[in-house]
Structures are given as structure tokens and as C-alpha cells.
């Protein structure tokens, strides 16, 4: 599949009731999404492995290119759905598992935004602890939770479960992990859920369940560190690519990335546009990341022609 190609896709998402077993009290939802919405989810899904290396010029572009190449290489278009590409069968089990996990993160973010209005989503192990270079733990251990944030200070915990098949054992583990957390700081959770992506007859599907909470755990971290973990990678991408325009911009800012084709036999390049408005850029420059999303709640529309703008204030376009 080609992320920069204008197209609308559908994915079947099964939503399971809180105290129901899979297959009972469920409903199937067909979600429509465009290539630009998926591209925005890929852009916004900073992966935890990125913190293993220090920042260098071009790091965020290289990470984004890697995520785009992965999605385009492991999925193929069948009508208006995405399916497992045949060539991934040449990979070994560990490689396929890693790819499924990364796809799970991207699609959990997309589904959470489309169905539940989640504006931001950050891996817990990218949120720094106060005054340290360490990251947030729960009960002494690192977890793979995705922390979501929506309007009106609505916090949520998501367990991404990416699998090649419908694994009830893996999904059950995700549900148990989601059920352990009750609060983020002093905020009761608006939602805690597991989201599993998997292939059925080759087609990409998903199932979401909000389990009954069995624990009273609290995740603690400064809110400003959460928003820094989400927005700083965008700022670094902007600053690396067009620093002169970024720091001298008085209007909206947009950069254009040149991407190679990942499809065999195609030559030349395609172009990806990423941008935001001038106020958001100013807040990024000042390191006031925690003010961006709260400001966006009062901004009616940043969308531009041939662009998709997320509720986070970041827009994408492609040609």
C-alpha cells in the first residue's frame, strides 16, 4: 500500500462489553479512515526505541521514514481494506512479532481517536520522571501502556496488542493490564481498554474491550512531561528540516519532506507536508508543550485544502 496515495479505507473493529466474554454482547463497527488520517497516526506514533540513541540532525526524519516504510511494506490494499502483505512471510517469527506490535500501536492510536475522541497518545515509557533521565514505572516495572488524553482533561490508559492472529491469551493479558490502573495522578480514568489488531483471512481487523477494573493503581508523572513527550518530536522534526523558516516564521509553518518510493519498480520521489499554526510553533519554541492541546480545544478548525489536521493541531498532506 502507499500512504501518500489518496484513498479511503475501512477496518472492522469489534467492541466488546466490559464484563462480556469475546463473542457475547459485542458489536462490529466499520471505521472509515483516509490515507492522511493513517499517515497522521504514523507521524504521531513515536516509538519507545527512539530514546535509545541521542538526538542528532535528521533523527526524527529517519524515524518517520522507517515507520512509513514499515507500514507500506507489510500491508497491501485489497479493495477498500488493508491486508497482510505476502512478503512478510519471509521474515522470522521475532521480526513478524515486532512488526505486529508496532502496527498495534499505530492502529490503537487511530481507533482511539476515531471512536473515542482521544487527541494525543504517548507510550508510558517515553514520559520522563521529574528531574531524572529515567522513565515512569508502575510497581517497580516498566509497562507498555499508551497514555491517552482528550478534551476536558480526559485521561485514558490503552494496552496495544498487535498479533498476526486472533490470540485470546494475548488479548486477555492486555485486558488484565488495563484493569489494574484506576487513576493518572489525581484524575480518575475516563477509559482504560485493550486494543488488539490481528489478521483474519488475511485482512487487518481490531477488537477493543474496556475490562472491569480490578485494581486501584495510580500512574504518577508531571503533565508537562507527558505533553513534552508528545510534541517535542514534532518540534525536533521541524527544527532539523527548516530551522531558518521555523524560527523566523510569523504565520503558519509547513515543511515538505521528500520521500523515496518503497514500491518496487517506482522511481523518483513523493512529497509529504507537515505543518501547524504560528501560535503552536511559538509554544513549541518556548517549551510550553502543555499549553498546546488545551489551546486547541478553543480552536475551531486548522484544516487546509488537501490536508488532514488532527485534534493535536498538526496537519499532514501528501502528493
Regions found by a protein language model. Name each.
Residues 209-319:
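Extended, charged low-complexity segments
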Residues 138-144:
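Short, surface-exposed coil-to-beta transition loops
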Residues 144-166:
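Conserved catalytic cores of phosphodiester-cleaving nucleases, focusing on short active-site segments
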Residues 162-222:
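Catalytic cores of nucleic-acid endonucleases
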Residues 1-31:
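N-terminal alpha-helical "arm" segments
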Residues 111-114, 146-148:
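Fungal eukaryote-biased detector of long internal structured cores
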Residues 114-138:
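A short acidic/basic microdomain associated with nuclease active sites
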Residues 31-111, 297:
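Interdomain/boundary linker segments immediately adjacent to catalytic/signaling cores
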Amino acid at each position: 500500500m502507499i500512504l501518500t496515495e489518496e484513498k479511503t479505507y475501512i477496518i472492522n473493529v469489534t467492541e466488546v462489553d466490559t464484563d462480556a466474554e469475546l463473542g457475547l454482547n459485542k458489536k462490529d463497527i466499520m471505521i472509515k479512515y483516509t490515507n492522511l488520517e493513517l499517515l497522521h497516526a504514523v507521524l504521531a506514533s513515536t516509538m519507545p526505541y527512539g530514546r535509545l540513541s541521542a538526538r542528532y540532525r535528521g533523527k526524527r526524519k529517519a524515524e518517520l521514514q522507517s515507520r512509513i516504510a514499515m507500514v507500506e511494506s507489510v500491508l497491501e490494499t485489497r479493495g477498500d481494506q488493508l491486508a497482510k502483505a505476502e512478503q512478510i512471510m519471509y521474515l522470522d517469527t521475532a521480526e513478524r512479532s515486532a512488526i505486529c506490535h508496532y502496527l498495534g500501536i499505530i492502529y490503537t492510536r487511530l481507533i482511539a481517536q476515531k471512536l473515542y475522541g482521544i487527541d494525543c497518545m504517548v507510550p508510558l515509557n517515553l514520559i520522563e520522571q521529574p528531574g531524572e533521565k529515567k522513565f515512569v514505572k508502575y510497581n517497580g516495572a516498566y509497562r507498555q501502556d499508551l497514555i491517552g488524553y482528550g478534551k476536558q482533561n480526559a485521561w485514558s490508559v490503552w494496552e496495544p496488542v498487535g498479533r498476526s492472529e486472533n490470540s485470546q491469551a494475548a488479548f486477555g493479558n492486555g485486558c488484565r493490564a488495563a484493569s489494574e490502573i484506576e487513576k493518572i495522578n489525581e484524575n480518575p480514568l475516563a477509559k482504560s481498554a485493550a486494543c488488539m489488531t490481528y489478521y483474519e483471512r488475511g485482512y487487518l481487523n481490531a477488537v477493543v474491550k474496556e475490562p472491569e477494573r480490578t485494581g486501584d493503581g495510580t500512574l504518577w508523572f508531571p503533565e508537562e512531561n507527558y505533553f513534552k513527550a508528545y510534541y517535542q518530536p514534532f518540534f525536533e522534526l521541524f527544527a532539523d528540516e527548516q530551522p531558518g523558516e521555523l524560527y523566523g516564521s510569523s504565520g503558519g509553518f509547513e515543511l515538505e519532506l521528500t520521500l523515496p518510493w518503497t514500491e518496487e519498480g517506482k522511481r523518483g520521489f513523493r512529497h509529504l507536508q507537515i505543518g501547524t499554526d504560528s501560535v503552536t510553533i511559538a509554544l513549541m519554541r518556548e517549551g510550553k508543550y502543555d499549553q498546546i492541546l488545551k489551546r486547541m480545544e478553543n480552536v475551531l478548525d486548522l484544516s487546509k485544502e488537501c490536508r488532514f489536521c488532527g485534534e493535536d493541531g498538526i496537519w499532514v498532506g501528501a502528493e
